[in-house]
């Protein structure tokens, strides 16, 4: 019998996940705060609610009686997940994991205090005055992030005391949900940022994908590439950390575990209990199973015998540059002209500056120069021109 999966949050990552589980014969109810979100376009049914409204969430769970609930975003009343688990509904990866990882405070304290992992020095602040004090304690430069946000929203780097007030205002405008508190992190002098996609299984060992390198701008990923070449010692340390934190959080699924690589070691940064935006590079066929196919198998309790690197690849985001509706895309012929190139348009009905509307992918042989693949992906992303009905 097919299972009914309720997807909470229906963006581009959710869309690829829905496609993966549909290929395995499952039914999906896609939920978001607006209609015609990307994942809703490929799901069996859809619901439009405020997912921070616990009563609205309870109502659609009672209506559809899902076997599995898969959260894709942070702005959800996640404490309701414990009740759903008691009702016999599988929450992915688990209610505990969803509650911890939707809030940067919970996951950072688990990593640094409970598990003793190496992280950046950090403090919390719930007001502008507390932020001034926290910055004084961790030092400059530092990074200010809302406890709940996504795609870099509300995140900024503070390099002088004069920037503190603007950082607070920006954090409040970019937060998800109703939590005003921020985390203030000392800047780590890293040379590389990586995502280690980690797969925990119901009936199998924890597996790791080849590391993915990425570059951030405005707190959001711009390009990613796989494999990211790091030392065997750093890879082993990252895998050990990822294994510890996912074991502590419990559950089955894919996790995007982010690290800073610095001269003095590996620093745990963040963790997402779901497919990761930097992992869209796996859509270029870099692995035998994409991150979305891995998540689908793990969620459904299906075996993942191994994860094999098949080729090198890179991704580059296609961003909107203005506000508008009903976007259309020109330049696809030029962007797809080179061998190994691919484009994914997400299907978002509304655009705004810096909103991610698609991704350009490039792949090559295993030994290919990933820097060159990255340059090609960026060039192809720039060839895609977005038109829209502009709003005033």
From Swiss-Prot:
Which Gene3D superfamilies does the record associate with it?
3.40.50.20, ATP-grasp fold, A domain, ATP-grasp fold, B domain
Look up the record and report any one GO term of the cellular component aspect: cytosol
Q: In which pathway does it act?
A: Purine metabolism; IMP biosynthesis via de novo pathway; N(2)-formyl-N(1)-(5-phospho-D-ribosyl)glycinamide from N(1)-(5-phospho-D-ribosyl)glycinamide (formate route): step 1/1
Q: Which domain of life is it from?
A: Bacteria
**Which processes are annotated in GO (biological process)?**
'de novo' IMP biosynthetic process
A GO molecular function assigned to this protein is: phosphoribosylglycinamide formyltransferase activity
UniProt entry tagged with the keyword Cytoplasm: no
Sequence positions that bind ATP: 104, 145, 150-155, 185-188, 193
Q: Which residues form the ATP-grasp domain?
A: 109-300
Question: Is Magnesium a UniProt keyword of this protein?
Answer: yes
| Binding site residues for N(1)-(5-phospho-beta-D-ribosyl)glycinamide | 12-13, 72, 277, 348, 355-356
* Chain sites annotated for binding Mg(2+): 258, 270
Query: Which EC number(s) does UniProt give?
Result: 6.3.1.21
Quickly give the catalysed reaction. Answer: N(1)-(5-phospho-beta-D-ribosyl)glycinamide + formate + ATP = N(2)-formyl-N(1)-(5-phospho-beta-D-ribosyl)glycinamide + ADP + phosphate + H(+)
Q: Which UniProt keywords apply?
A: ATP-binding, Ligase, Magnesium, Metal-binding, Nucleotide-binding, Purine biosynthesis
What does the UniProt record say this protein does? Involved in the de novo purine biosynthesis. Catalyzes the transfer of formate to 5-phospho-ribosyl-glycinamide (GAR), producing 5-phospho-ribosyl-N-formylglycinamide (FGAR). Formate is provided by PurU via hydrolysis of 10-formyl-tetrahydrofolate.
| Entry's family note | Belongs to the PurK/PurT family.
What is its quaternary makeup? Homodimer.
What's the name of the protein? Formate-dependent phosphoribosylglycinamide formyltransferase
